From Swiss-Prot:
Ranges annotated as spanning the membrane: none
Pathway: Pyrimidine metabolism; UMP biosynthesis via de novo pathway; UMP from orotate: step 2/2
InterPro entries: Aldolase_TIM, OMPdecase, OMPdecase_AS, OMPdecase_bac, OMPdeCOase_dom, RibuloseP-bd_barrel
Protein name, as recorded: Orotidine 5'-phosphate decarboxylase
UniProt entry keywords in alphabetical sequence: Decarboxylase, Lyase, Pyrimidine biosynthesis
Upper taxonomic lineage: Bacteria, Bacillati, Bacillota, Bacilli, Lactobacillales
Positions annotated to bind substrate: 10, 33, 60-69, 123, 185, 194, 214-215
Organism of provenance: Enterococcus faecalis (strain ATCC 700802 / V583)
Documented EC number(s): 4.1.1.23
MF terms (GO), sorted A to Z: orotidine-5'-phosphate decarboxylase activity
Record-stated family: Belongs to the OMP decarboxylase family. Type 1 subfamily.
CDD domains the UniProt entry points to: OMP_decarboxylase_like (cd04725)
Length: 237
């Protein structure tokens, strides 16, 4: 597991991100997530700016398209030097293989290839919704583990999943396979639009490699204090 929780920068503009980051010590190197809202508003410049501030970036765009398109997109994203990026496992093994090839092609000589992970089922998706909307008539965990095995077959580094599925995925894949888990909430906090949530401590105990935390930090009265508490809960054994 990695000791820094990933902070979801779910803000609409770089200006708001800058205001938020001012609440942290300048020397604090963070691991942050840039999702669709922020990336589509600010473009690649937001990633470059965050890296200039000394932060690691998980670029969460969930690519899902034909293999050729995804490969070319990943070649360009690799040039940004992000630490992690992702695709939708539902795009299939060929698409995921193409994504990995694109990342390798786009990574600068001597630089580390970004970790590539696949989204299995969104943590906002309930089993009932999966059955009704996606016509996937197996238990939700079975679907998630199937997608994880497809991602492993494609040569990906891991998956995005609920911590509730992490142990099953680890039993079905190689030991180094990553389980990055959103839907993390400290004890007693609101779950919002998430369906399958756990605490940082529980995520650690059941096998998460990385955790992503958004509103419990970004909307806290004291974000740095909230971050430190979550980091402690996540990293202490």
């Amino acid at each position: 597991m990695h000791d820094r929780p990933i902070i979801a920068l779910d803000f609409p503009t770089q200006k708001e991100v800058a205001v938020f980051l001012e609440k942290f010590p300048k020397e604090e190197a963070l691991f942050v997530k840039v999702g669709m809202e922020l990336f589509y508003a600010e473009g690649p410049a937001i990633v470059r700016w965050l890296k200039e501030q000394g932060h690691d970036v998980f670029l969460d765009l969930k690519l899902h398209d034909i293999p050729n398109t995804v490969e070319k997109a990943m070649t360009n994203l690799a040039k940004l030097g992000v630490a992690i990026t992702n695709v939708h496992a539902a795009g299939g093994v060929r698409m995921m293989q193409a994504a990995k090839e694109g990342l390798i092609k786009g990574t600068q000589p001597g630089a580390k290839v970004p970790e590539l992970i696949a989204v299995t089922q969104l943590t906002s998706t309930s089993e009932e919704e999966m059955h009704h909307d996606q016509l996937i008539n197996v238990p939700l965990e079975t679907s998630v583990i199937h997608y994880a095995k497809c991602a492993e077959k494609a040569g990906l580094d891991g998956v995005v999943c609920s911590a509730l599925e992490a142990r099953g995925i680890q039993e079905a894949t190689k030991q180094t396979f990553i389980c990055l888990t959103p839907g993390i909430r400290p004890a007693g906090s609101a779950v919002g639009d998430q369906q399958r949530v756990v605490t940082p401590q529980h995520a650690r105990e059941i096998g998460s490699t990385y955790i992503v935390v958004g509103r419990p930090i970004t909307q806290a009265e004291n974000p740095y204090e909230a971050y430190q508490e979550i980091k402690k809960d996540w990293s202490e054994k």
